[in-house]
Amino acid sequence: KQLPHLSFLETAKEQSFMSKYEVADRYQLMWRFRTNSMFDIANYYSMHPVLLDEHFRSLPPIINFSNREFYGNRIRVMRQNNPNDKILEIVHVPDGKVDYDATRNLPEIEALVKRIHEIIVDNERENPDNPITIGIISPFRAQVEQLKISLSKVISDYMMEKHKIEIGTAHTFQGDERDIILISWAFANNSFPQSLTFLQKPNLFNVAVTRAKNKMINFVSKDFTDLPDGLFRSYLS
């Protein structure tokens, strides 16, 4: 349920390698690197696949949704949380909307940047020698780029590096983690319906919501009760 590999190998180049090394026609579909990774091939030929079912990264409230939706509750969560901690948080942005070309949700960005500033100020005051690591995710590239611009105006390069602040799509965080993850979903009442289809792609969604170790903060501009059935509505509810 993770993201597949990304290949920038041109189709023509790939075919030329097939011809050069005389790969038989019956094997070419399997050995096309544009569509199959070495992991895919190993998995195809595996007689007895093993599920790595122990999860050490996230606190239970963070991983429980993916465990249920994607892994059939087969994952054993090895961490325990303090029931008094607010681990999952939803920040509703009532004036959130996407701009004229439906690529950026500026009110969400403003709310998220403000929250990050508060997190850093609190951490620097209370425990400056143990900096919280922070990740910022959005499903949409334009939102990511605007987040980088807006955050750079408020947070210094020194603090960005100290708190290992990374901003990107789910692809950026594949295999990575942070103490706190903030997600700007960027979907609003005036968003194109196709945007919802995109952000609910299972692999992308699963990676996005499982990068946090200790806390997840979701910024949303649309009430979940107004969303159609699907991953996004189920997650927010």
Predicted regions located by residue number:
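Conserved helicase motor core of SF1/SF2 NTP-dependent helicases
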Residues: 1-237
